[in-house]
Amino acid sequence: MSRDIAGIILAGGLSRRMGGGDKTLLALGGRPLLGHVVARLAPQVGSLALSANGDPARFAASGLSVLADTVEGHAGPLAGILTGLEWAATNTACKSLVTAAGDTPFLPVDLVAMLASAAAGRPGSIAVASSSGRRHPTFALWPLGLRQALRHFLVDEDNRRVSAFIERHDFVEVEFPLLAAGGGQVDPFFNINVADDLAVAERLLQSIEP
């Protein structure tokens, strides 16, 4: 566990491709999708919260503090990241924040360790995950000192692109290996976008999780 690193799970999306609603509450292997994400991320951080809008009571079973966006207009993942940075700065003793999408049940159990190792010795830098040469901007380690710059970027510049904000600052990409799964391999950042993805995740679950 990295006690000086807080974590936030991003679950504020509208899930249009899944017919609306909270896809993180869909059942996977007998428990909510969110439960798998929490089980993998919680042991890696000192404090963990959930970024989601609407009635927080629907996430009560997760045991997490639920943080609504601090900017209006459903501004996407960057709004959740900003909310997480501001929460961590005022409610924890942590120095940085790791973010993860709430629809990725197989996220790396060494996500924080690898991102933190890459960022070590580079004060103020963002460490962002990648796999198979593809960047995953919502899986990143963010210095809390970037929160004012992010609020300006999101609110004053009205720019919602996560990668665009990352590229404006010093950053390092961290390549994560594929996971072994039933004789094959799967991207650890595999996410649930449509019903077929959920069916695939069900088949993969037993071969990936210990």
State where each predicted segment sits.
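Nucleotide and nucleotide-moiety/phosphate-recognizing core
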Residues: 2-159, 167-188, 199-209
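Regulatory input/activation interfaces that engage signals or partners
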Residues: 192
